[in-house]
Amino acid sequence: MFRAFHGQVIRISPTSHDYINPMDINLDYADDDDPLSLKSDFILSLCELVVGGKNGLEPVEKTVIDRCVRLVYQDFLSDPVPEKMPILEDLYNLLREQKEQEAQRLATALEIYVNGSLKVFNHRTNVELSNRMVCFDIKDLGKQLKKLGMLIVQDQVWNRETINRSA
C-alpha cells in the first residue's frame, strides 16, 4: 500500500544493502548556528545505548565523546561534500587514538558495530531520503540492534524535518 502512494521503503537489517549513516549531519540540524552540539548530543545517546549499564556514561566518557565528535566532523565542515561525511568507524578510530582509558573502553564497546557482526550502521547513507513518504522497515534488525535502529531512524526524521523547515 505504501508503494501505491509512491512512498519509499528502506529496509534496514544486517543482511540489507540499504544503509543509513548515524553520523549524517545536516548543516541546518539546529535552529541556531551550532548543529554540531545537537549532533554531539545524539552521538552521546547512541554511545549510551552501545555502552549500556544502569548508570549510563561517566562524565569523562561524555567529554571524550564530545571532543571526538568535534574532531571527526572537521573535514566535512570545512568542505561539506558527501564523500567527507564521517562514519562510525571514523569515530571509533578517533576514540582509539585518545589517551584516556575511558576512550579505549568506548572504542571497545563500539567495535562490534564497526568491525563485528552488527556493523549495519557503519556505512555512508546509500538511499534517497528526500521522498515525501519514507518508511523505515526495521523489523529484521533483531534484539541487539532494534533500540539503536530506532534512535538512528528518529535522527534521520529530525534531519529531514530541519531540511523541510529551512526550505
Language model regions located:
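P-loop NTPase motor domains
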Residues: R3-F5, P22-A167
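Glycine-rich phosphate-binding loop of nucleotide-binding enzymes
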Residues: M1-P14
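Interdomain hinge/linker at the junction between the two RecA-like core domains of SF2 helicases
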Residues: P14-P22
